[in-house]
Design a protein with these regions (language model features):
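C-terminal engagement/docking regions of AAA+ P-loop ATPases
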Residues: 56, 237-316
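Pre-Walker A (pre-P-loop) alpha-helix and adjacent loop at the N terminus of AAA/AAA+ ATPase modules
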Residues: 3-41, 46
Length: 316
């Protein structure tokens, strides 16, 4: 699948999801960057903004299997990965798959889970497999996690470990709709019988696999590779940042830039592509100093400052 075909397919998905969910197009694009870029997406929003509905309809539009895991403080790793159950008829233990065995997994309120359970999800996200009772089992392909978390200021939530956060290609937020959007939401509800809207399937599973290979055909000028590296390195020199973007984060910025270029139907990356994805790809990877955290420094402002300070190469 070339970039032009990928663009047309992504537009169909964006239009289909937009028919069911009232949100900014950039939000949907961020999620598709995660899908096309072969990464995972972290959504941070207060309850009731439509995170679960979004994940479910993305899976439906892409023609993929979907499961939801509600993370709670007492959730065990086996509740996510599955467990062996004794079969009395055969006198053997049979493995019963957990909800992690789906193409798209919604990890709801991930920052309420104990570290041991988070570690099980971490292995699945990074390796595409889970280990149960010493036995490794492959997960379906494609495999994509959409995790949600409530803002850490809310009661009963805990910040995700740095290693966990770094595994997400993109972190984004729906936010509250504006007044016109909220009225549109009510008008849509008034025009249907079902409480929740649904979308039609746009893709087949094999189609999604082809789409995720499309960014590998996108060209990136050597000057832009230097630009990406310079952006990442600049985050490590800011006095408000204790831990800047890791080399893995640098690579993810490159991959997300190619994925966004694919969404735009271009066969090459531009500086604007890099700037467009820098916020959702980089901001959540920064660890602030204690002083910066106490003073409520916004990570997004740091990324904006980095983008303003790094010279943009001229690409012909």
């Amino acid at each position: 699948m070339d970039a032009s075909q990928a663009h047309d397919e992504c537009e169909r998905v964006l239009e289909t999801i937009g028919e069911a969910i009232v949100a900014d197009r950039r939000f949907f694009e961020d999620i598709l960057v995660g899908v096309v870029g072969r990464g995972h997406v972290l959504l941070e929003d207060v309850p009731g903004t439509g995170k679960t509905l979004t994940a479910r309809n993305v899976a439906r539009a892409l023609g993929l299997s979907f499961s939801r895991v509600q993370f709670t403080p007492d959730l065990l790793p086996s509740d996510v990965t599955g467990t062996h159950i004794y079969n009395e008829n055969d006198a053997t233990f049979e493995f019963t798959e957990g909800p992690i065995f789906a193409n798209i997994v919604l990890a709801d309120e991930i920052n309420r889970a104990p570290p041991k359970t988070q570690a099980a999800l971490l292995e699945a996200m990074e390796e595409g497999q889970v280990t149960v009772a010493g036995e490794t089992r492959e997960l379906p392909k494609p495999f994509f996690v959409i995790a949600t978390q409530n803002p850490v200021e809310q009661e009963g939530t805990f910040p995700l470990p740095e290693a966990q956060v770094d595994r997400f290609l993109v972190k984004t937020s729906m936010g509250y709709p504006d007044e016109a959007g909220e009225i549109e939401l009510l008008e849509r509800r008034a025009s249907r019988d079902a409480q929740s809207p649904t979308v039609e399937r746009v893709f087949e599973e094999s189609h999604v696999r082809d789409l995720r290979l499309a960014p590998e055909t996108i060209d990136t000028d050597p000057d832009l590779l230097s630009y990406i590296a310079a952006i990442a390195r600049q985050t490590r020199t800011d006095g408000r940042v204790a831990v800047g973007v890791s080399p893995r984060g640098t690579q993810r910025l490159f991959e997300a830039s190619r994925a966004y270029a694919t969404l735009q139907g271009r066969e090459y990356v531009t500086p604007d592509d890099i700037k467009r994805v820098a916020q959702p790809v980089l901001a959540h990877r920064l660890v602030l100093t204690p002083d910066a955290a106490v003073n409520d420094v916004e990570k997004s402002h740091i990324v904006e400052g980095v983008l303003d300070s790094v010279p943009v190469p001229t690409i012909e």
